[in-house]
């Protein structure tokens, strides 16, 4: 067997019980449930941190957050430092084994040039680098009530270090579209690949397309929008795994799904 391909799906602030395979009773996540049914389901899996940046640093480095150099939530301004360039990551190590490496989604490990995805082993990357963005304008609004030079709101959407403008498009679907494009590119090469897909959902702001909201019209609004956001992720995971199958890569691809750090009690929303 040739070297396996790897796909890591990550959700943001998703609760333990927000998937039907983990006990959710008021909505279903059939494609993620299928992963659990056909693979291994971990019922006692612990994040290395209760917040975003340290948990992501631990995932990508295999180190405790403090040893990885990321001990707290990182800032969102464009010169914010983050994961030290000297810290090895899964992407840097796989590149040494001639893997293609791709990321599409949320980074949150620094915006400074030395801390961006391409400095940490990713050949191609797409997404945003701060902690959260509006799902349609792709602007980081945190701190908007206290603006100042270099502070927020800040547009935060990039591809390979070049700022992108796709106003009005839903970010979950944008992540998925880029993942599908990366898969097709990867399949053309006679080399294995690593695809990292860190979704921003269901992190606030609580935004979902009307078509997804309409699926859950019987639920209270707060639960309705949570269900809608996770349904979009579930459909996206399914689309990516279907593409892996279509490309004839399924038998040699290991896919893994997890949440970053559990749910948030915050109530911020930007409309």
Predicted ranges, named:
Residues 1-271:
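Formylglycine-dependent sulfatase
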């Amino acid at each position: 067997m040739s070297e396996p391909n790897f796909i890591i799906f990550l959700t943001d602030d998703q609760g333990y019980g927000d998937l039907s395979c983990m006990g959710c009773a008021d909505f279903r996540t059939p494609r993620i449930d299928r992963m659990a049914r056909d693979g291994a389901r971990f019922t006692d899996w612990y994040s290395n941190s209760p917040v975003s940046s340290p948990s992501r640093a631990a995932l990508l480095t295999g180190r405790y957050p403090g040893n990885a150099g990321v001990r707290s939530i990182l800032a969102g301004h464009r010169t914010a430092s983050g994961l030290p360039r000297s810290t090895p990551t899964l992407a840097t190590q796989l590149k040494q084994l001639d893997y293609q490496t791709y990321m599409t989604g949320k980074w949150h490990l620094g915006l400074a040039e030395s801390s961006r995805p391409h400095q940490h082993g990713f050949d191609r990357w797409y997404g945003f680098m701060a902690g959260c963005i509006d799902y349609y304008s792709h602007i980081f609004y945190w701190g908007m009530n206290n603006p100042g030079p270099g502070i927020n709101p800040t547009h935060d959407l990039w591809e390979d270090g070049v700022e992108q403008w796709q106003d009005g498009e839903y970010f979950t679907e944008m992540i998925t579209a880029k993942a599908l494009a990366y898969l097709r590119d990867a399949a053309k090469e006679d080399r294995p690949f690593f695809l990292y897909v860190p979704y921003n959902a269901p992190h606030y702001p609580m935004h979902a397309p009307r078509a997804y909201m309409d699926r859950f019209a019987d639920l209270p609004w707060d639960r309705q929008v949570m269900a809608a956001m996770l349904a979009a992720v579930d459909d996206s995971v399914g689309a990516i795994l279907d593409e892996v199958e279509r490309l004839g890569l399924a038998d040699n691809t290991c896919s893994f799904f997890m949440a970053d750090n559990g749910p948030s009690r915050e109530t911020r929303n930007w409309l």
